Amino acid sequence: MNSNQNNDIKTKHHFPLLLALALTMGVFAAGSEELVISPLLPDLAKAFSSDVSVLALSISIYGVMIFIGAPLLVPLGDKYSRELSLLAGLMIFIIGTVICALAQNIFFFFLGRALSGLAAGAFVPTAYAVVGDRVPYTYRGKVMGLIVSSWSLALIFGVPLGSFIGGVLHWRWTFWIFALMGVLVVLLILLEMRRHAQHKNSGKEEIEEPAGTFRDALKVPRVPVYITITFCNMIGFYGMYSFLGTYLQDVFTGGNTAAGLFIMIYGIGFSMSVITGKIADRIGKMRSLLIALGVISVLLACLPYAPASMFLLIASLFIWGLMQSLTVTLLSTILSDCSERHRGKVMVFYSLASNLAVTLGSALMGPVYVAYGYAAVGLICAAITVLGFVLSVFAYKKYGKLEQKADQSLSQ
């Protein structure tokens, strides 16, 4: 049990509502702006007298800058303070979003998107690290579930809302609203900083340790194995999810509408991470991860055959979303608790592993889908997820006692 968990024993009854709201809203804003580009592409192409394929590069630019932003800005949290890293990310996000809203040519729009991607790369992993720093151990799964569910909420509500605003008013208003949301998150974090400073002054002075290096972070027990599990889970997920819509369009006559409705069922399941995270807090995070990865492995192999029954397809998509959100919540929570000193850098590796899986999952499974169909994609993605499951069994046997001791201490 680390010192962070010792502190949690004294504060376990205090749910950090303000902090949870700030982090959830920040990730929601970042996720919404990342995803809202797709429905706005025709309007953007018309505004800048360009082609949709050219404007689509703004999505790639955003992704590349996430890779740069995470290792560049997140270590500020380890060296100085998490708030500094969060505020730096938010200020860059606001500036980038305002540039997008004001852009009169495609160059400045791409510049704004690049800054927004840089900001997301800094804010999201730092938000995960802050949960490990500030949230009592008994509430970590619940708060991490809130943050994870904000990605799903961005897809279900943020993107349609942004698209609606762009259609009714103007696409520029979409970015103005996201910028205002960023300002609101800044105010919430400043309030949280003030509250934390008062609490810190009333307690004992904390001893600062050197921040360490990325290599030091990889030497922390549990980190390499759970980063690998993250990669296995994410590449299996994105490889399967990338072609789900295309497969459903081929199976059903409703085209995009039918496929969109089925994918929404997955999103509803994913948004349940607040509930599943709370349950995982009670039965144990590492044990819950075993169950989630086992269920996902079976689902991925069977999903291509689910359309034979409408009930089976709906149930499979909902359970897949439920288990995937639980897995993401658990992995981010477990990794954030591995090391207080290296927490920021650990979450950088988590973010990089997830984003690398996004790229490789669709790229590697594309040729497989074209040549052999969705069933082959399902078997390969299931096999990769099984590898993550096997690693999680190994990790539970080797490190499970650490979590059990922490839970026993917190229950006393």
From Swiss-Prot:
CDD domains: MFS_NepI_like. The keyword DNA repair does not apply. GO terms for cellular component: plasma membrane. Pfam families: MFS_1. GO terms for molecular function: transmembrane transporter activity. Keywords: Cell membrane, Membrane, Transmembrane, Transmembrane helix, Transport. GO terms for biological process: transmembrane transport. Belongs to the major facilitator superfamily. This is Uncharacterized MFS-type transporter YwfA.
